[in-house]
Amino acid sequence: MKLLFVAGILLTWTCCSSPPMQPLEPAFFCWETTLHVSAEERSLQDSLGCKKLYVKILDIGRNAGSGEIEPYSRTDMSDSSGLKGLRIIPTVFTTNEVFQNISEEKIAWLAGKIAAVATEHGSFEELLFDCDWTPSTRDAFFSFLKQMRKKVPPVARISATIRLHQYKFPQKTGVPPVDRGMLMFYNTGDVDEESERNTVFHPDDALKYLEGAPKNYPIPLDLALPLFSWGLIFREGELWKIVPGPLPLEDMRSNGKWIENPLTDPFTAQLWELKDGTFLGGHYLRPGDHLRVSAISPALLFKAASLAQKLDLADDATLAFFHLNIAGSAHFSAQLLDSVCKTVRN
């Protein structure tokens, strides 16, 4: 009788317990205008077991003079030496302005142009669109996505990036008519505000988007985490330039031209004040300019991964790191990134 009772408990526990979640599939974004995967970058991917690479193929915006829709840049993909065995996911960035005051005819035209570029390099399993749509452009952007569905092969998925504010307020912002979403779990601060703690990612800011968010997002979600840094240059209190990282911090510490302010907490962006004129990122900075450096450390990346446990990710979700740049990823080994993937699924 006791054995039957114990067996009943075990059977009940087995029936009620959730099946283990699938491991996240690791991937990277490649956001350069010339596609080149170095030997070091490929080694990082191989060591991580990464078989997928999201490659930006187009930047699309409006001409400042004519207002016409045109590509800002088109990625040179002639160098395929480091791509063998990788599944390439073409990715298209469009500014929000593209979908302002646009006709259905123009939407269909744009979809056709993009489909033609995307198919130039062979078949693909997915086509990702990156656009921070707003209530005023939502209908046009969603119409565009439906047009893209008609233009690409039926076997290919259509996906779209999801910002944190869109994740938290799907009823207000709408849910894109796509097969999957890529949730961008970064850019949590306002780059125009010099007082922001860390515009790339700060746990307190990210948590605000998670509190009160729906438990179930209407479409399957993949996840993107940051591996990048940037410097925001402020002149007379206003944002002047954004300089992509990594920045030459050691040189800045030793050349005597900068005042380095101490960090207020380990996750806060670092503030630098310029004493003497100098160049940075191809820009001439004047005395009195301020530089706020927002970066991701291993500790901050693990903090993001822990918070990401609260997200409604797909069972077969991908974790894509933004972006593949060995200079900017020097502190992130394959072993560390694998631990990050496992932390999200913990």
Language-model segments: residues:
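Acidic/aromatic/glycine-rich contiguous surface patches that form carbohydrate-binding/processing clefts
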Residues: 319-346
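Chitinase-like catalytic core of GlcNAc-active glycosidases
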Residues: 21, 28, 59-183
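Catalytic domains of carbohydrate-active enzymes, especially glycoside hydrolases
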Residues: 36-62, 117-124, 310
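Substrate-binding surface in catalytic domains of secreted glycosidases
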Residues: 146-249
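C-terminal motif of bacterial Sec signal peptides marking the signal peptidase cleavage site
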Residues: 12-15
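Structural recognition of alpha->loop->beta junctions
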Residues: 49, 118-127, 171-190, 246-261, ...
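Glycan-binding loop/region signatures in secreted carbohydrate-active enzymes
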Residues: 234-304
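Conserved, mostly hydrophobic/aromatic
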Residues: 53, 129, 181, 223, ...
